[in-house]
Design a protein with these regions (language model features):
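Class I S-adenosyl-L-methionine-dependent methyltransferase catalytic core
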Residues: 1-177
Length: 177
């Protein structure tokens, strides 16, 4: 997310589906003002996530983010790339746990199946002009992606739309000056 489009504050950030830690690793490379609460359902990622955590970060016991009892204060940012079929449940849970919610998801996430939710919770949408790779070999699929950002909480009927300009953009997680 270009820093001139979205100003993601420092502080406590949650990644509720941390997986192999790609989002926290990328953020940590550009920002020192973020402390993490990392959550993952798949225990196979425990060792990888423990190497990413810095002093002050919290690695939650492995389990389901959406249904777990939440005992932490509201975070500054919740940033995620949840499974497509569960994304709406993740977003709803995220609203209760963070001030700003940012989700990387297929562009088709804005669709009639979620119309009743989106009528009252319209995100800002930042389309990626290039397909991201989610594989170790750098390959991509035939799917377009976008960042969906709810910058100010729950209820709103309109959001902004922008195309990220990759050749000129600052890193998507770089703190704005």
């Amino acid at each position: 997310l270009e820093s001139h489009l979205v100003d993601l504050p420092g502080g406590v950030w949650i990644d509720p589906c941390a997986g192999t830690g790609r989002i926290p690793r990328t953020v940590n490379a550009y920002r020192r003002d973020v402390r993490w609460i990392l959550c993952e359902i798949d225990e196979r990622h425990r060792e990888t996530l423990s190497t990413i955590a810095r002093p002050g970060d919290v690695l939650l016991p492995f389990g389901d983010f959406v249904h777990r009892e939440w005992r932490h204060p509201v975070a500054d940012v919740l940033i995620m790339n949840p499974p497509f079929s569960h994304a709406l449940n993740f977003v709803r849970a995220a609203f209760e746990r963070a001030a700003v919610v940012a989700m990387l998801q297929r562009s088709t996430w804005i669709a009639p199946a979620r119309a009743s939710f989106l009528r009252d919770h319209m995100p800002d949408v930042y389309a990626l002009p290039k397909r991201p790779s989610f594989t170790s070999d750098g390959g991509t699929d035939a799917t377009e992606y976008a960042w969906f950002v709810w910058p100010d909480g729950l209820k709103r009927r309109f959001g902004r739309t922008a195309m990220l300009d990759l050749p000129r953009q600052r890193n998507l997680f770089e703190a704005s000056s």
